[in-house]
């Protein structure tokens, strides 16, 4: 009996990718501006941190949950899901060229999403809003440079 219950528990926690854990999801929205105007065509990646904010890959690579681009008004809305044993730690990476001059590649801004915004199952109950962000600020905590999307074109 114990073996059967253990088997049922383990098989109920597998995802289609073969991971052990439970399916969790998150939705996020916001508006991005550049110099007071909508930041159009900015790429946003929805990620899940597997190494407590350190993007070293020592523990486990961070999980990619999807991407989108801002619309003509600078808005974005996206959701994603991931199987994890513990609670997911979602964040978005925003890749942009706002107020960047001729610098190579893009500015990359990480915005963490609180665990309280996550839900069990494939679809989140609510959408977490990061609000309106002005990307032209020169010194932003959590920002670095990225050449992941070299051909990214966007307007402001």
UniProtKB/Swiss-Prot annotation:
This protein's UniProt keywords: Glycoprotein, Secreted, Signal
Signal sequence region: 1-17
Chief localization: secreted
Keyword Signal: yes
A GO-annotated cellular component: extracellular region
Glycan-bearing residues: 151
UniProt keyword Secreted, yes or no: yes
Top-level taxonomic group: Eukaryota
Localization per record: Secreted
InterPro entries registered for this protein in UniProt: Transthyretin-like (IPR001534), Transthyretin-like_sf (IPR038479)
Family membership noted in the UniProt record: Belongs to the nematode transthyretin-like family.
Name by which UniProt lists this protein: Transthyretin-like protein 1
Organism of derivation: Caenorhabditis elegans
């Amino acid at each position: 009996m114990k073996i059967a219950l253990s088997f049922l528990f383990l098989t109920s926690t597998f995802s289609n990718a073969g991971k052990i854990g439970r399916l969790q999801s998150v939705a996020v929205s916001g508006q991005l501006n550049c110099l007071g105007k909508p930041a159009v065509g900015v790429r946003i990646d929805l990620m899940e941190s597997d190494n407590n904010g350190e993007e070293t890959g020592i523990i486990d690579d961070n999980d990619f949950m999807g991407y989108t681009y801002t619309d003509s008004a600078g808005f974005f809305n996206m959701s994603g899901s991931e199987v994890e044993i513990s609670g997911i730690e979602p964040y978005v990476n925003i890749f942009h060229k706002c107020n960047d001059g001729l610098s190579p590649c893009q500015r990359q801004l990480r915005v963490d999403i609180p665990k309280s915004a996550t839900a069990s199952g494939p679809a989140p109950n609510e959408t977490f809003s990061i609000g309106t962000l002005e990307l032209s600020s020169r010194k932003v905590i959590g920002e670095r440079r990225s050449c992941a999307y070299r051909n990214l074109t966007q307007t402001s």
